[in-house]
């Protein structure tokens, strides 16, 4: 799932490189007006993404499906956890219509985890992609999926939908996975990514958050693990604490260190590497289809 981080909730003494300008520009203003008018559900707004203005200006937006309540309670994530609502079977059409209204050129679809459902929500996923393709044939797609508990028939539905990019985030290094992603497993995420590639997905992608107490060596090893799983694209960004109830930020990683990881990633053979303090899973997503 797309990492939901509120850029306004930061410890005192936050580094200057984490301060962002308010989004401006005609395209942003137009899209903001449409979102407000039609009450469209984008994770860009609900997650207070610091890159919203830039992405919207380039015709990219991220939509979250299957409700806004997750069955998992990851220590980093600002999405509500609990018992989700009944599946809205009209949601695929609603999302497709939102993309059409906003005239989105490249859409990223993500979701909460739905471990309460027999299909983990995978049927709604494929129906959403079909609806988007039908209503917006020129729009390219990235699906940022949960692990579906590694169940192959659920992953096969995503493969059958054939999005341009399929993403699944490992989020953190192996050692911290149990603390950061309580109900997920590091190796299962790698298996999911490896399976997607083996089944014919052209571009796979994963993301890592930094500042949770990981070491440089662990970050580099995680990047190696992703390459060994044939991942094409990696995003690396700064973890920001959504609220006081969530895991604290242990360290603010410098822009120079992010640049180092970017260079290392390119040397490892990733097709695209997005590495920087404000990078999120969907940052520059439209460029990842090239």
Curated annotation (Swiss-Prot):
**Residues holding [4Fe-4S] cluster 2:** 70, 74, 77
Q: Which domain of life is it from?
A: Bacteria
Gene Ontology cellular-component terms listed:
cytoplasm
Task: Write out the annotated subcellular location.
Answer: Cytoplasm
Give the cofactor binding note.
Answer: Binds 2 [4Fe-4S] clusters per subunit. One cluster is coordinated with 3 cysteines and an exchangeable S-adenosyl-L-methionine.
| Record-annotated Radical SAM core domain positions | 56-271
InterPro entries with a match to the protein in the record: Aldolase_TIM (IPR013785), Elp3/MiaA/NifB-like_rSAM (IPR006638), Lipoyl_synth (IPR003698), rSAM (IPR007197)
Task: Provide the protein name.
Answer: Lipoyl synthase
What is the species listed in this Swiss-Prot or TrEMBL entry? Flavobacterium psychrophilum (strain ATCC 49511 / DSM 21280 / CIP 103535 / JIP02/86)
């Amino acid at each position: 799932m797309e990492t939901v981080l509120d850029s306004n909730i930061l410890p005192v003494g936050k580094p200057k490189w984490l301060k962002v300008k308010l989004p401006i520009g005609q395209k942003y203003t137009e899209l903001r007006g449409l979102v407000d008018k039609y009450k469209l559900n984008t994770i860009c707004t609900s997650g207070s993404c610091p890159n919203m203005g830039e992405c919207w200006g380039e015709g990219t937006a991220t939509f979250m499906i299957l409700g806004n309540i997750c069955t998992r309670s990851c220590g980093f994530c600002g999405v509500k956890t609990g018992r989700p609502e009944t599946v809205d079977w009209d949601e695929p059409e609603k999302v497709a219509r939102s993309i059409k209204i906003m005239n989105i050129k490249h859409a990223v679809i993500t979701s909460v985890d739905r471990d309460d459902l027999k299909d983990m929500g995978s049927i709604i996923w494929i129906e959403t992609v079909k609806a988007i393709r039908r209503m917006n044939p020129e729009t390219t797609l990235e699906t940022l999926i949960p692990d579906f508990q590694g169940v192959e028939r659920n992953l096969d539905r995503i493969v059958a939908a054939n999005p341009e990019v399929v993403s699944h985030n490992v989020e953190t290094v192996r050692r911290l996975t149990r603390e950061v992603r309580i109900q997920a497993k590091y190796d299962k995420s790698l298996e999911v990514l490896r399976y997607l590639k083996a089944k014919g997905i052209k571009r796979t992608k994963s993301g890592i958050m930094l500042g949770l107490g990981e070491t440089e060596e662990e970050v580099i090893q995680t990047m190696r693990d992703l390459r060994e799983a044939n991942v094409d694209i990696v995003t690396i960004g700064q973890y920001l604490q959504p609220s006081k109830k969530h895991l604290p930020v242990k360290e603010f990683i410098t822009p120079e260190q992010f640049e180092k990881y970017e260079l290392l990633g390119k040397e490892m053979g990733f097709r695209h590497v997005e590495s920087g303090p404000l990078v999120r899973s969907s940052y520059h997503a439209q460029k990842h289809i090239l």
